[in-house]
């Protein structure tokens, strides 16, 4: 009997031996294989990418300058990329992987990497001896391509494929690269200083031009902004005017409509008041009629009855009573006529007195007015002295001269006060009195 062995795409399965003394090897990648017990040998070979770091220390170049070069190489065991996989094995895969299996079968990945690394370092040393420092340092890609081109056939015969090879670092212990860099740096610095000066000059010119352009753009923009602002303000003013006009018209229309509504309301109120007054007049008229009927029932009819009784009594008392009543009525009539005549005469006398006073005032002028003033002075003095009537005690502080001065000043204030109250200049009136001094 036997076992079934499987493998993934990153691993090769090498099957050798078999029944009847077979010497054919089979290589399976990403498949499976049957192995008989005791007579079949099954081994595995990794197909993963191997990263190598070749390093050559103090290797002399063609100029005798010792350099140390480090690189990075990516390698893997070759296999076909176009073979057709079957369930058991593939002849092309057997052929391509046969060399690698012969070289590395049974070895670990570390041992395989060490073998490839030594081969790459040997070719790297050989190529370094044919190049100058400048060629190695300045054109690393060309150097790496050359190493890969030279080393590829050798590692290919071992069934190894170089996927990539790059130079990681180049340096030396004799300061050759530093010295080379200093000279180049000096040249570069010189050119750089000149370039900086020219660049500064060009930058200054360009900056001035840019600043001028920026200022032109700024001024142009400011001008446009001001124009737009002015247009905006003008349009806004026009819009505001239209809005205010519309608001004013709306307000006027509202006020007019409100006035009309108030007028209609007032008319309705007036109509209501008219109706109320009419109703009130009707009610009052009805009340008058009611009172008239009431008076007729309570006063007139009893009075008529009483008159009829008195008339009956008068007739009973015959002519004496009638004549007495007539005499009394005549007496009362005459008394009323006399009183009315007296009142009329008193009114006429009062009117005549007022007319005569007016005539006298008009004829005598200031004298009449003086008479009025003189008649009014006691009343004015009484009114002025009225508050003093409530005074219990008056204390005068100062000498007799002060009292005299106060009295004089008080008296001197009377004419202006009278003039302000009555419109009469008391000084002028008194000056017209014979023997008086103003």
Swiss-Prot record:
Q: Which SUPFAM superfamilies match?
A: Band 7/SPFH domain
Q: Which InterPro entries match?
A: Band_7, Band_7/SPFH_dom_sf, Flotillin_fam
Q: Where is it localised?
A: Membrane
Domain of life of the organism encoding this protein: Eukaryota
Gene Ontology CC, one term: flotillin complex
Q: Which UniProt keywords apply?
A: Cell adhesion, Membrane
Q: Cite a single GO MF annotation.
A: structural molecule activity
For this entry, list what GO says about its biological process.
Answer: cell adhesion; melanotic encapsulation of foreign target; positive regulation of filopodium assembly; protein localization to plasma membrane; regulation of myoblast differentiation
Write down the Gene3D superfamilies for this protein, in alphabetical order: Band 7 domain
User: How does this chain assemble?
Assistant: Heterooligomeric complex of flotillins 1 and 2.
Annotated family = Belongs to the band 7/mec-2 family. Flotillin subfamily.
Report the protein's function: May play a role in axon growth and regeneration. May be involved in epidermal cell adhesion and epidermal structure and function.
In terms of PANTHER family, this protein maps to: FLOTILLIN-1-RELATED, FLOTILLIN-RELATED
Q: Mind telling me what this protein is named?
A: Flotillin-2
Originating organism = Drosophila melanogaster (Fruit fly)
